[in-house]
Design a protein with these regions (language model features):
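Flexible, glycine/charged-enriched surface loops at secondary-structure junctions
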Residues: 39-43, 187-192, 239, 270-277
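Flexible glycine/proline-enriched surface loops and loop-helix/loop-strand junctions
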Residues: 114, 158-159, 209-213, 241-246
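Core structural elements
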Residues: 203-208, 225-236
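N-terminal export/assembly segments and adjacent metallocofactor-ligating motifs
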Residues: 1-184, 221
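A glycine-rich, hydrophobic/aromatic-adjacent loop/helix-cap motif
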Residues: 232-309
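Short, amphipathic alpha-helical segments that act as regulatory/interfacial helices
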Residues: 29-32, 178, 229, 259-267
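Conserved short loop/turn motifs at secondary-structure junctions
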Residues: 47-54, 217-220, 243-250, 282
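N-terminal leader/propeptide and maturation segments of large enzyme subunits in energy/redox metabolism
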Residues: 6-18, 23, 184-222
């Protein structure tokens, strides 16, 4: 009964009345023009959420409209909800060939990500359209799904291994997994030898995060941590991804950095000669080369935000 089925306009008394859609759009346009004339184009912001990235027309139109008014206040679910992803990549670098896709992989680790409900996951996790069906289909082909989350989510109910860790301890878990992977030689040694710097320094940094120590902070057993590390490290294809929650928790950037680290040391990238998904159908092709792209700063350039003075 409360579903909005027609265009409404709020009256001064706070109630709503119906209005012709074209008239509503005209009135909105007039008000936006007045705001831009009085305060400048930056006063108008655009926010594109996760669903906007799954709607090619909406994403393109929103960008074009925003550019037409000359505003720099363009925000997305990455810049607002998950800034750790861009910030970690800005100091880590990237593999131009891209990481493994979900389809065809034999493992996927979901850290604080519940795509069954959110219909969202970073690339490498279950695609947003019918994620449960995609998870079920890949598991039938042998994929192992690891879920790490303080809550037993819907995705956890469909996983092969679930670790119900304490909130805010994602970096502890990931450090322990990397420690086990390196200690047991489960990393991609050839890939690391050619493309990874400071591997020995990484080994030293994660050494204190033994399964026993991590378990005392995570609230799970050491055996579960080792099982997760071996399940991920022994796989051939598949990546770890994080959702919104880990980025909003303490040390969110570190969490994303460690996820990039885990995927990298395990060599979960598209290498020379491998097939890549969607080489370019609705958008121009992006060159996919088997090489490293140096880290590029994510800040200290472009217009400054007003929120910090």
């Amino acid at each position: 009964e409360k579903r909005v089925r027609e265009t409404l306009k709020q009256r001064p008394d706070g109630d709503f009345e119906t209005i012709d859609t074209n008239q509503a759009l005209d009135e909105i346009a007039e008000r936006i023009q007045a705001l831009v004339q009085e305060h400048g184009p930056r006063c108008v912001a655009t926010y594109v959420g996760s669903a906007g990235f799954q709607n090619s027309a909406a994403l393109l139109v929103s960008k074009a409209w925003h550019a037409s008014i000359g505003s720099t206040s363009y925000y997305t679910s990455v810049t607002i909800d998950q800034p750790g992803k861009a910030l970690s990549a800005s100091r880590f670098g990237m593999w131009v060939g891209g990481t493994h896709a979900f389809t065809g992989s034999d493992v996927c680790m979901l850290v604080g990500n519940n795509p069954v409900v959110s219909q969202y996951t970073p690339f490498g996790g279950p695609p947003p359209f019918s994620p449960y069906a995609r998870m079920r289909a890949e598991r039938k082909k042998g994929m192992k799904i690891i879920v790490v989350d303080p809550r037993k989510t819907e995705a956890a109910n469909r996983s092969d291994l679930f670790l119900q860790v304490n909130p805010g301890e994602d970096p502890t878990f990931l450090s322990a997994v990397i420690n086990v992977v390196l200690s047991e030689g489960l990393h991609d040694q050839e890939f690391c030898a050619h493309h990874v710097e400071d591997l020995e320094s990484l080994r030293e940094q994660v050494a204190p995060f033994t399964p026993d120590y991590a378990a005392s902070r995570l609230g799970v057993s050491p055996d579960q941590i080792v099982e997760a590390a071996r399940m991920f490290g022994n796989a051939r294809r598949g990546v770890a991804v994080a959702g919104t929650g880990p980025d909003m928790a303490p040390r969110g950037v570190l969490t994303e950095h460690l996820i990039l680290t885990l995927n990298t040391v395990c060599g979960r990238v598209n290498k020379e000669g491998e097939r890549i998904p969607n080489a370019g159908i609705l958008s121009p092709k992006i060159p996919r080369r088997a090489e490293v792209h140096a880290a590029a700063p994510a800040y200290d350039y472009g217009p400054k935000a007003r929120v910090r003075g």
